[in-house]
Amino acid sequence: MEGRSVEVVPVSQLLTRSFYIPAYQRGYRWTQDQVEDLLNDIHDFFPREVPGSEDKTWYCLQPLVVRPVDSSEIVIKDMTSNKIEYELIDGQQRATTIYLIGHYINEMFRGKIKESELSLRYETRFSSTDFLKNLSVGTDENVAIDSSNIDFYHISKAYQTIHSWVTRLNAEGRFKQDRF
């Protein structure tokens, strides 16, 4: 176990990092319930003062297991930039959902000033990287479900779930953008 360590980092720090998703990882398969559970957990969490300290409590996701890598260790077709910093060993479903939430918030609320988004690169599902970057809510306020391949289908369904969840909470006057 020499050389291994556990580091707790805020999600905001993850947004500046690049992740490589190796071939052994299954495709994205989170369901509507799983996406909504994560959204509700984040939204309902409220930081509280820690007694005797200036610190506040913080929301803790289930872990992402990563391994630092050198870009020369990884061969990804058509990769011309984006230095890869970490191999994502476990937590790809969570990382992808965090990406989708951040991408949605950027698209719908941030305007011209975009916050950083996770960089996800796939060893074997090359088109998934571009698909993630190009997700959007249409002018008709709907998310098109792409069933051209199974990964696109589940990713677009998750994005649709995020859009429906935010739209519903907005209509009820309960959406708190600052929680994201």
Describe the predicted segments one by one.
Residues M1-F180:
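Glycine- and hydrophobic-rich flexible loops that cap the catalytic core of alpha/beta enzyme folds
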